[in-house]
Amino acid sequence: MARILRGEIRWADLNPVRGKEQAGNRPVLILSHDVFNERSGTVIAVALTSHPQRAAFPLTLELQSGDLPKKSWVKISQIRTLSIERIGSRVGRALPEEVAQIVDGFNEIIGT
């Protein structure tokens, strides 16, 4: 498999899930650094959705990246550690400013 890089949007198999976790085969945005992804065999990612979101930042962020096939929102509260075995092909890439804003949103949610 090609290297999995921070800021990439890739397909991922999120099943099995519990409760209100995002399910299914869906795009995720990779937040973890490249070296972590390569050495750990896992990635830290957040789920994306194409359904318009009522919740605002810091819970969600609309992506402005032009290379996605659909308008998409990052569900910042839906962060997961995933085995690289769950990660599929590349869909697109988030702008570096978007990745930074998502990390800021996550920090706001957890209270740092």
Where are these predicted regions, by residue range?
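Conserved functional hotspots at enzyme active or ligand-binding sites that engage polyanionic ligands
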Residues: 1-112
